[in-house]
Design a protein with these regions (language model features):
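Phosphate-binding site recognition
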Residues: 1-338
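A cross-kingdom feature that marks ATP-driven nucleic-acid transaction machinery
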Residues: 302, 309-426
Length: 426
């Protein structure tokens, strides 16, 4: 069952009729559906598939690669000692397929996990493509990985042998609200639009998370089961999520923990102070990686300079984790249901709805009739002032959730609220 992804499928299918071999990178957040998309697009064209192993040594990765070659039909071979030898085995296997007009797909999933320290993996991949695979006209090499920052740094923006070698990039985005509604309809979950929204505010548009919602159960019942009950499918997701994406996630987790405490975001200096991290290259790199992977966004208040940019945590699941999962210190198996109607629930829902609106700016622009107008999105806030001697409020604070600054000399001011509205997913 493939929901949405029409443009991505059209792009991948289009490569099957190209006159040259193709080097494709599919990347995006963990659990967003990359592997499923590739297998749906090329299900009858694969001649070799391999998946990197999380946390494995170079020797283990090489052994697994040889095993994949064996399963693909190569037969037994000597254990490769280097990635150069391993890709040489792959090339020898490919030569058993006569060159023809029909494309043959090589799919290497979770590629970043294969790049262990001092393995020369990227250089060997570079040689495999430039010296061998690109010489043919009937191959499609598809690489994939959840570590988006690794794919960007080592392949998309590579300035070595892989520079400008990619012929196609597919950055797979999470589902929109509309696509999640279609998913619920396809699974016969029976959810109204408001329930789809509630689920989206916690799960985001991550298909893997939505796959655990069971028919005949309300959103609250499903959340209690998958997040709070022993053996729930997403009970341990937080640790697995960041550990699988970043080799040394301590700095990344410190940043998102700090941002979770300040939902409107922090500027760099505030973030350093709150996270107690050192202002160095590692900190800057972690910020960049979190932004590339879609966990945080960097934005400027209208009229402010780039150096005054604010960093804000925007990943729906991560924020749900800090607001609810990490707060369930008593092990309440019905913590979500118990929280319904509480102050913490209303506070979370308001902020979560703001994020959902921010994640659907393009849809909002389309609904307001200016989707073709170039624009930038900002927020605005005013802290207000107090009398320094008495503490009495002199001027009240104010906030505008979203400002859309348009190139046609117009600014749209939008505020988001869940109170007393009839919510419809168009």
């Amino acid at each position: 069952m493939l929901i949405g992804r029409e443009n991505e499928m059209a792009t991948l299918h289009g490569l099957l009729t190209s006159d040259e071999s193709q080097f494709v990178a599919v990347y995006g957040r963990r659990r967003v559906g990359k592997t499923f998309l590739i297998r749906e697009a090329y299900k009858s064209y694969f001649i070799f598939q391999h998946t990197g192993t999380y946390g494995a040594t170079r020797r283990q990765q090489l052994a697994n690669f040889r095993e994949s070659l064996y399963l693909a039909g190569m037969g037994k071979s000597a254990m490769p000692k280097t990635w150069s030898e391993a890709f040489g085995l792959l090339w020898n296997f490919l030569k058993t397929f006569p060159e023809s007009e029909e494309k043959k797909v090589i799919f290497i999933d979770e590629l970043p996990w294969m790049d262990t320290p001092k393995s020369n993996f990227v250089r060997s991949l570079d040689h495999f493509w430039n010296a061998w695979a690109s010489m043919r006209k009937d191959l499609i090499l598809v690489i994939c990985g959840s570590a988006t920052s690794w794919i960007i740094d080592n392949v998309v923006m590579n300035y070595g042998g892989l520079h400008n070698r990619l012929t196609c990039k597919v950055f797979l985005q999470p589902f929109t609200l509309r696509e999640c509604k279609q998913y619920c309809e396809a699974k016969n979950l029976g959810y109204m639009d408001r329930q789809v929204l509630e689920a989206y505010m916690a799960l985001g548009g991550i298909p893997y998370y939505w796959s655990f919602l069971k028919k005949g159960k309300s959103v609250a019942q499903n959340f209690d089961r998958i997040f709070f009950q022993p053996g729930g499918e997403l009970v341990q997701e937080f640790d697995a999520l960041y550990a699988s994406l970043f080799k040394k996630p301590r700095c990344h987790i410190a940043i998102i923990t700090a941002l979770a405490k300040k939902k409107q975001g922090l500027i760099r200096e505030e973030l350093l102070k709150t996270s107690r991290l050192t202002d160095n290259a590692d900190f800057s790199k972690a910020l960049q990686e979190l932004e590339q992977c879609g966990f945080i966004r960097k934005f400027t208040a209208i009229g402010k300079k780039t150096k005054d940019a604010t960093f804000q945590l925007i990943d729906n699941y991560t924020l749900f984790y800090f607001d609810f999962i990490s707060e369930n210190t008593n092990g309440d198996e019905h913590f979500w249901s118990s929280s319904a109607g509480s102050a913490i629930h209303y506070s979370w829902a308001g902020r979560a709805f703001e994020r959902v609106c921010m994640q659907h700016v393009n849809q909002i622009k389309e609904a307001l009739g200016f989707s073709a107008v170039i624009s930038s999105v900002h927020s605005w806030s005013y802290k207000g002032t107090k009398d320094p001697s008495t503490g009495k409020t002199l001027t009240k604070g104010a906030q505008i959730d979203m400002l859309i600054d348009r190139n046609d000399d117009t600014i749209n001011l939008l505020t988001s609220s869940l109170k007393n509205i009839h919510f419809v997913i168009g």
